[in-house]
């Protein structure tokens, strides 16, 4: 609670959890292998189901206790699962319903009971799951990956924007990695232009990749800051990349 109070006093939103909380596909695949996990889901493998249940119970209880201790000061509870990849969904709606829907519904309900909003990380093409996740109680979708099929953020906003807040959308695969600062500025302006009344947490589509030009990263924050009412003054006061590169803690920027 003291940490939450300190963050609130500094004007920050308070978020608990990570993209690795729950995470029944990707994290379990790190030990069993992705092919095996996908087969497990099809075959209802009891070993996999036992691991999944253990993860669910662990992260559910960790977040429940954290929310309870914070006493209503948490804004968002974060979890994640990679239901999609670069080319399309990795599982069917039937598999989602059989293995994941009830667990996420129970988790979202618990989070809401403590006055927090739900936030879920999903890589890749996951458009087909958004309606159902909204029904189950999802509030914020992290992160919009625009280089995948069916994930145009303008279309997603049109379809789901009245029920869902989006996070991300500035591409780490193209614009930030290979573009110019002017390209980054243009993408930031286009993204924010789609959300004149809010509904987007602007940011990169994933972790900014090693080798991405520092000038592009700074362009993201400078442009967003010039269009926002408030932003961290430390970021806006940075000098040239050459002068400041050794002073920037990138982890704190994201």
Regions found by a protein language model. Give the residues of each.
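Active-site loop segments of alpha/beta catalytic cores
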Residues: 1-254
């Amino acid at each position: 609670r003291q940490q939450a109070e300190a963050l609130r006093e500094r004007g920050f939103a308070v978020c608990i959890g990570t993209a690795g909380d729950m995470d029944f596909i990707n994290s379990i695949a790190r030990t069993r292998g992705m092919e095996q996990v996908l087969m497990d889901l099809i075959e209802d493998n009891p070993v996999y189901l036992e691991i999944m249940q253990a993860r669910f119970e662990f992260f559910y209880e960790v977040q429940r206790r954290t929310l309870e201790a914070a006493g209503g000061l948490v804004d968002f509870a974060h979890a994640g699962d990679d239901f999609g990849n670069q080319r399309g969904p990795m599982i069917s709606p039937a598999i989602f319903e059989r293995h994941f829907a009830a667990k996420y519904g129970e988790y979202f309900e618990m989070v809401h009971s403590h006055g927090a909003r739900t936030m879920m990380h999903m890589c890749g093409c996951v458009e087909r799951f958004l309606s159902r996740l909204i029904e189950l109680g999802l509030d914020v979708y992290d992160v919009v990956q625009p280089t995948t099929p069916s994930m145009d953020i303008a279309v997603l906003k049109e379809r789901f924007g009245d029920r869902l807040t989006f996070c991300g959308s500035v591409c780490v695969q193209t614009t930030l990695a290979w573009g110019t600062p002017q390209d980054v500025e243009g993408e930031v302006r286009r993204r924010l232009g789609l959300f004149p009344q809010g509904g987007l947490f602007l940011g990169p589509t994933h972790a900014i990749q090693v080798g991405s030009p520092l000038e592009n990263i700074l362009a993201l924050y400078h442009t967003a800051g010039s269009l926002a009412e408030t932003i961290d003054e430390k970021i806006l006061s940075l000098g040239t990349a050459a002068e400041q590169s050794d002073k920037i803690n990138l982890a704190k920027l994201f």
